[in-house]
Amino acid sequence: MTISISDLRKDYRQQSLSETEVDPNPLQQFQTWFKQAIEAEILEPNAMTLATLSREGKPAARIVLLKEVDDRGFTFFTNYKSRKGEELAHDPWAALVFWWAELERQVRIEGSVSQVSAADSDRYFSSRPWGSRLGAWASEQSKAITGREVLEQNLRALEQEYRDREVPRPPHWGGYRLSPTLIEFWQGRPNRLHDRLCYRLQGDQWQLERLSP
């Protein structure tokens, strides 16, 4: 059976999005949508695409998990020596995208990124499962290795080392917070005439505008 990619399409008809319905604060609006994504039992609603830039201006994107959102922004955790960590150290601006297909919704976010405090990183790290804490030590993220056995050998050694004591947070592992300057809410609509409401930070105030699809 031959599948024509160009024929793959879906007409979105679930909901609409109007300026009169949304919260004047986009972070509060995100919280509303995020709660609805959880209630819809979407698989990993906190999964988001993180896009960064290399020194040469080449983009890279990957899925990471949102671990906290508040009025300060969107927090995730990773290895500071990974490719994304190195790129954020060079250019601390990034973009996030959430895609909730079951709700026919997308949220796009742009902003500056900074490391969270060591205390915040310690607090989250200590909440992780034991194996995940060991994994943060076992893997030199984004580095080439000769085979999976390297990781498994590292893990076995760490299991012995920390069998009877707490696993500390590696100094090269911790959190980042993206402080948004732009948040766009996208709701799929019929005939590709989607609703797009975009908040832009002007000074300390959020300005809302509708974008043409």
Swiss-Prot record:
Give the GO molecular function terms: FMN binding; pyridoxamine phosphate oxidase activity
According to the record, cofactor stoichiometry and binding are noted as: Binds 1 FMN per subunit.
Q: What residues does substrate bind to?
A: 9-12, 67, 124, 128, 132, 192-194
Q: Which cofactor does it need?
A: FMN
Record Gene3D superfamilies: Electron Transport, Fmn-binding Protein, Chain A (2.30.110.10)
What is catalyzed by this enzyme? pyridoxamine 5'-phosphate + O2 + H2O = pyridoxal 5'-phosphate + H2O2 + NH4(+); pyridoxine 5'-phosphate + O2 = pyridoxal 5'-phosphate + H2O2
Residues engaged in binding FMN: 62-67, 77-78, 83-84, 106, 141-142, 186, 196
Which keywords does UniProt give here?
Flavoprotein, FMN, Oxidoreductase, Pyridoxine biosynthesis
- EC number(s)? 1.4.3.5
Q: Which GO terms describe its biological process?
A: pyridoxine biosynthetic process
Q: What InterPro entries does its record include?
A: Pyridox_Oxase (IPR000659), Pyridox_Oxase_CS (IPR019740), Pyridox_Oxase_N (IPR011576), Pyridoxamine_oxidase_dimer_C (IPR019576), Split_barrel_FMN-bd (IPR012349)
Family membership: Belongs to the pyridoxamine 5'-phosphate oxidase family.
Q: What subunit structure does UniProt give?
A: Homodimer.
- Matching PANTHER family, A to Z? PYRIDOXINE-5'-PHOSPHATE OXIDASE (PTHR10851:SF0), PYRIDOXINE-5-PHOSPHATE OXIDASE (PTHR10851)
Described by its record, this protein's role is as follows: Catalyzes the oxidation of either pyridoxine 5'-phosphate (PNP) or pyridoxamine 5'-phosphate (PMP) into pyridoxal 5'-phosphate (PLP).
Name the chain's protein. Pyridoxine/pyridoxamine 5'-phosphate oxidase
**Which species expresses this protein natively?**
Cyanothece sp. (strain PCC 7425 / ATCC 29141)
